[in-house]
């Protein structure tokens, strides 16, 4: 069984793809700087698992940029 469960992660972050991106970036940060850990205890020993646990705990949230209509091109 996966921990944390996907439904727990998607309740915190809207997109599975965004979860993967945020987890990958955070895992790299944890690998480079293990002292930046945000939880006292992790179930996983791998950095990706630790990053997912932080997302599930609400310690990590993605910052989604606001898009303006002028940022999109329309083709007629």
From Swiss-Prot:
This is DNA-directed RNA polymerase subunit omega. InterPro entries: DNA-dir_RNA_pol_omega, Pol_omega/Rpo6/RPB6, RPB6/omega-like_sf. Promotes RNA polymerase assembly. Latches the N- and C-terminal regions of the beta' subunit thereby facilitating its interaction with the beta and alpha subunits. Pfam families: RNA_pol_Rpb6. The keyword Transcription applies. PANTHER family: DNA-DIRECTED RNA POLYMERASE SUBUNIT OMEGA. One of its GO terms (biological process) is DNA-templated transcription. GO terms for cellular component: DNA-directed RNA polymerase complex. It comes from the Bacteria. Keywords: DNA-directed RNA polymerase, Nucleotidyltransferase, Transcription, Transferase. GO terms for molecular function: DNA binding; DNA-directed RNA polymerase activity. Its EC number is 2.7.7.6. SUPFAM superfamilies: RPB6/omega subunit-like. The RNAP catalytic core consists of 2 alpha, 1 beta, 1 beta' and 1 omega subunit. When a sigma factor is associated with the core the holoenzyme is formed, which can initiate transcription. Belongs to the RNA polymerase subunit omega family. It catalyses: RNA(n) + a ribonucleoside 5'-triphosphate = RNA(n+1) + diphosphate.
